[in-house]
Design a protein with these regions (language model features):
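Solvent-exposed, non-transmembrane regions of integral membrane proteins
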Residues: 1-418
Length: 418
């Protein structure tokens, strides 16, 4: 019996050790990159993905048990564990369908999101009363199965409506033009062709049913406060450990990059945005991401630039600055990503759907987390650390704009002209 207990303890020490943790983070990064590169529709790829994240959840659970007294540590790690468990268990119970509704007849059938050839009934039907192009809003009536109107409401982008556990989200619209025989009765005359036409609008809705969303919200909340904890503790450590002049130069470069990107980033300055971008979450999400991009880019530049110094003490100061600012960058990135998840729920009914953009955001986040854990205790040294940051910066660029050119982004909800 004692031998069994000792073997279990030894297994927990190894599984919760830094080597296994780094290995599983690297594996999770690799399968996430593969998912972000190609359309994800093969069973073998899905099994590999779920197995890797299942092992990551197991390692996280062991690590949390070994560090249960550390408040800030538990907030972030238990939060991530809850999110992964939600993704593994809850995702199988998520129902996601598309429905196109018009003004002429009540629609009661919807197609499966992943398998458009499959149709089913959500338990109610919808009739479109009117559609506003400027706001992408639909005036709809919802009917029960016996034909009784149970709700009349307006569905707008970023403001879904809930009916019988289903969230009805506004996704877009379709305009169809019909040629009519009689001008007075059916429409307007087209002077170029000499025919008579009538326009009809169809609203594209997404129906989402996710009974596990409270579990996801719990994990997101814990991760959010864990990210805040990491940000505050890293800032305090930076103030204590770094020289004033070096910190001033480093911070000035990061802030300059932040301002430059803000000045030349079109969505921040165009007066007319797409309806999905007209959200109170837009400004904080974009600002946090641009700031973390600026900080992490600066960290990469200085990680490479420190090799030009012959003075080893100065190199060590710069390396310490790089480590601290990567900590700040990953904390801010975590906050921005979680705000984006909340925004996604408002817009599309789900916190996370492994959209191409979301997949690359997760891959970038995992690689910077790998760097953060690998540099703790200097488990990897330079120049390996500089090479890792360079690779992470490439992933960051792919997440920002490169993903738009990938085959996996053809159906992405994040690819749009702002």
């Amino acid at each position: 019996m004692e031998n069994i207990q000792e073997a279990v303890k030894q297994m927990f020490r190894r599984v919760g050790g830094w080597r296994v943790s780094l290995f599983v983070m690297l594996m999770a990064f690799m399968v996430t990159v593969v998912r972000g590169l190609v359309p994800w529709n093969t069973v073998s790829c899905l099994v590999a993905f779920e197995a890797t994240y299942g092992f990551l959840a197991f390692v996280l659970g062991v690590v949390c048990l070994r560090n249960w007294r550390r408040t800030g540590f538990l907030l972030s790690h238990v939060g991530l564990l809850v999110v992964i468990v939600y993704g593994a268990i809850g995702s199988r119970e998520i129902k996601r369908m598309k429905m196109t509704v018009g003004t002429e007849e009540v629609q009661s059938w919807a197609s499966d999101y992943d398998h458009p050839e499959r149709y089913s009934q959500p338990g109610f039907s919808i009739l479109l009363n009117g559609f506003s192009i400027s706001t992408h809003s639909s005036d709809i009536s919802v009917f029960s199965q016996d034909g009784k109107e149970i709700l009349r409401t307006v569905v707008t982008v970023n403001s879904p409506v809930e009916v019988d556990g289903w969230k009805i989200c506004q996704m877009g619209y379709e305009e169809k033009v019909y040629e009519k025989e009689y001008e007075k009765e059916y429409g307007e005359e087209d002077s170029s062709e000499g025919g008579v036409f009538s326009k009809n609008y169809f609203s594209k809705l997404q129906l989402v049913r996710d009974p596990w969303q409270p579990c996801a919200l719990l994990g997101i909340t814990m991760l959010f406060f864990g990210g805040l904890w990491l940000l505050v503790t890293t800032l305090l450590r930076a103030r204590k450990d770094l020289h004033g002049s070096s910190l001033y130069v480093f911070s000035s470069l990061a802030i300059t990059l932040f301002i430059a990107v803000c000045m030349f980033y079109p969505p921040l300055w165009r007066k007319q945005l797409m309806p999905v971008l007209r959200s109170p979450w837009f400004a904080p999400h974009i600002a946090l991401y641009i700031y973390c991009y600026a900080v992490l880019t600066t960290a990469t530049i200085m990680a490479v630039g420190q090799f030009f110094f012959r003075d080893m003490k100065r190199r060590e100061v710069w390396q310490k600055m790089v480590d601290l600012f990567v900590g700040i960058g990953i904390a801010v990135m975590t906050l921005g990503m979680l705000i984006g998840a909340i925004w996604a729920k408002d817009a599309w009914g789900l916190y996370w759907s492994w959209d191409a953009k979301e997949t690359w955001a997760a891959a970038t986040w995992l690689l910077y987390l790998f760097f953060l854990h690998a540099r703790k205790g200097k488990r990897i040294a330079y120049p390996w650390a500089a090479g890792l940051l360079t690779l992470a910066l490439c992933c960051l660029q792919m997440c920002w704009w490169g993903v738009n050119y990938l085959p996996s982004a053809q159906e992405s909800l994040h690819v749009y002209d702002v």
